């Protein structure tokens, strides 16, 4: 899917809008600017020193002949930037760097009238000077707002974002809800089918900030037509720190709909969620660690539908863990590794799209484990050449979902037609059949090089060239029951204790074998991109880039279902009217290429992993149709 966009935006006092230029998947920021003397002449040879609790050691740069400097690969955090040159008063600026941002920071130095240097301290806001519309919200901000503590709650605070998609899913700039990109630490966490973020990979107290990009997005980002969301988790530091939190939730604390017929059945029960984080140094300025955990257990009741009403106990236990190591073995070279694991264990689960008439054989315990691994490297090879690379992998599995019996009797599911296909006797789906246990995984490799070019008359250029390889795989054999048989009686009778299916000429059997098992689909996209963030002067800047995406998709039978490619040019211009960041006019044009949809390209014409359907309608004598019995049970 290709989507073009043309935007003209007038922004006043854009205190939260940030310009994103780092490559997709690499959660660092960049500081860049120009240093001049009080009359505006460029100052070469100024030493720029960057310090932060988020940075291992310090970083330095020296302005070139045009007064330009750049400090790349900075982890998100609050920074103190010092500008020093012999014969001039030094200046210090405080600035906030967020993930995937290039923050502009210019400075003017005055000639020192005395031997001692004067220190000028000022505060610099994170103000965009590009045409890319992006908003960053830190946890510090969102904790003060009356909102849910989720990534998506931060996302919907951005302009152009709403939750009007199917099932309340997030849409950005009018695109389909499944065609956004959601990442944590630059790693894709989306479900392969629906495109929604995998919530069990997020520990809310571990999140440092969330950035949402909605328009004018750089060519370094791809596989979307809506927007790009990246959450960055905390990391360790040179001092130990941690947190502990208990969050209490109760349905009754929510307001009900004013219309009685639309009110939900709330349960007056307090459900706690426990979270904890800790981080600190293993070796100061060399090796840091960070760890986080989250635990929630919700005990509740399942409801039996007529003819025998009642309830039965159910529970969902949600456990999440994260660990991160940050290592700087050499100055200007940093390696970060992180691993996140989440698992939801569900007791007495059943296929909730249909009502349940009894628990005998229809409910089961299942697990939904998922994990996320990422390794990131960034390095400064010279004063104007930088490299970054990242590998990541996400795994998600449905474990023990369905019947535990593949024999004819206990493995056959019974769904009663006049009870809304109410379930009885046997469970839908199969946990013990060949190839059971659906897997939805992805793998990503990304590398880029950045060259900083400074010119006297044409400003400065951050030229990025990169390669991005993303593979999404799914293995699914959709067994409909343990025996592949399903019985659809017309109705059901009860003596108050047992259920008896009513079988007449409206009843039928469904045989649903899988003729060809899934080999696993593979949605592969190879991409290359080049992007120039061009700062002409203090008022004019541009973003010029192009991306090429090559799709190669194979369905569950291993047959090719997609083999195409597309270019997506990006062009943006920004005019800072007064040169102070308070009033900007931006215009952008972009072509975005959406990701391959697993639900379409992954199934293919062969239907591997999908069940066939053979219907057999009842033509024998009626069973259990008498008003008083005796009746025959399914046991």
Question: Which residues does each predicted region cover?
Answer:
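Transmembrane beta-barrel wall of Gram-negative outer-membrane proteins
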Residues: 241, 267-345, 365-388, 569
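Solvent-exposed loop/turn elements at secondary-structure boundaries
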Residues: 556, 561-565, 572-635
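Transmembrane beta-barrel strands of outer-membrane/channel proteins
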Residues: 122, 244-250, 291-295, 337-341, ...
């Amino acid at each position: 899917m290709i989507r073009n966009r043309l935007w003209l935006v007038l922004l006043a006092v854009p205190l939260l809008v940030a310009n994103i230029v780092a490559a997709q998947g690499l959660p660092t920021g960049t500081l860049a600017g120009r240093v001049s003397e009080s009359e505006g002449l460029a100052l070469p040879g100024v030493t720029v020193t960057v310090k932060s609790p988020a940075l291992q050691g310090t970083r330095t740069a020296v302005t070139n002949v045009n007064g330009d400097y750049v400090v790349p690969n900075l982890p998100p955090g609050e920074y103190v930037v010092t500008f020093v040159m012999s014969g001039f008063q030094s200046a210090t600026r405080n600035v906030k760097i967020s993930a995937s941002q290039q923050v502009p920071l210019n400075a003017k130095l005055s000639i020192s009238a005395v031997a001692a240097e004067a220190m000028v301290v000022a505060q610099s806001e994170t103000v965009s000077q590009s045409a890319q519309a992006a908003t960053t919200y830190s946890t510090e901000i969102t904790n003060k707002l009356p909102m849910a503590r989720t990534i998506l709650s931060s996302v919907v605070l951005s302009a152009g974002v709403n939750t009007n998609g199917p099932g309340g899913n997030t849409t950005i700039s009018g695109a389909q809800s499944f065609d956004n990109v959601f990442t944590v630490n630059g790693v894709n966490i989306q479900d392969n089918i629906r495109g929604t973020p995998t919530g069990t990979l997020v520990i809310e107290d571990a999140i440092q900030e969330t950035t949402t990009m909605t328009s004018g997005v750089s060519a370094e980002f791809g596989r979307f037509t809506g927007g790009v969301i990246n959450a960055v988790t905390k990391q360790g530091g040179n001092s130990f720190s941690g947190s502990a939190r208990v969050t209490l939730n109760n349905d009754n604390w929510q307001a009900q709909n004013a219309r009685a017929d639309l009110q939900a059945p709330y349960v007056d029960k307090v459900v706690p969620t426990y979270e904890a984080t800790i981080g600190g140094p293993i070796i100061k300025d060399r090796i840091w660690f960070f760890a986080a955990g989250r635990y929630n257990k919700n005990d509740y009741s399942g409801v039996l539908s007529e003819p025998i009403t009642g309830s039965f106990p159910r529970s969902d236990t949600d456990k999440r863990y994260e660990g991160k190591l940050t290592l700087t073995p050499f100055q200007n070279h940093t390696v970060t590794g992180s691993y996140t694991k989440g698992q939801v264990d569900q007791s007495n689960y059943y296929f909730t799209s249909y009502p349940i008439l009894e628990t005998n054989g229809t409910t089961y315990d299942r697990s939904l484990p998922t994990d996320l691994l990422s390794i990131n490297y960034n390095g400064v090879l010279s004063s104007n050449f930088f490299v970054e690379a990242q590998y990541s992998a996400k795994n998600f599995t449905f474990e023990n979902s369905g019947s535990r019996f593949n024999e004819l009797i206990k493995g056959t599911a019974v769904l009663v037609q006049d009870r809304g296909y109410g379930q009885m006797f046997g469970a839908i789906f199969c946990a013990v059949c060949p190839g059971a246990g659906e897997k939805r995984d992805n793998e990503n490799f990304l590398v880029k090089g950045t060259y900083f070019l400074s010119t006297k008359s044409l400003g400065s250029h951050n030229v990025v060239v990169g390669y991005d390889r993303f593979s999404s795989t799914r293995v699914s054999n959709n067994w409909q029951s343990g025996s592949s048989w399903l019985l659809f009686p017309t109705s059901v009778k009860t003596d108050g204790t047992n259920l008896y299916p009513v079988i007449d000429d409206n009843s039928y059997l469904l045989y649903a074998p899988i003729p060809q098992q899934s080999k696993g689909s593979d949605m592969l996209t190879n991409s290359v991109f080049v992007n120039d963030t061009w700062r002409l002067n203090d008022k004019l800047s541009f973003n010029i880039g192009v991306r090429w995406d090559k799709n190669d998709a194979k369905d569950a039978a291993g047959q090719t279902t997609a083999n195409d490619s597309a270019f997506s040019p990006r062009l943006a211009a920004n005019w800072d009217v007064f040169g102070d960041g308070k009033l900007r006019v931006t215009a952008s044009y972009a072509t975005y290429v959406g990701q391959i949809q697993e639900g379409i390209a992954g199934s293919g014409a062969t239907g591997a992993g999908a069940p066939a359907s053979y219907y057999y309608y009842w033509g024998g004598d009626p069973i259990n149709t008498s008003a008083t019995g005796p009746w025959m049970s399914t046991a």
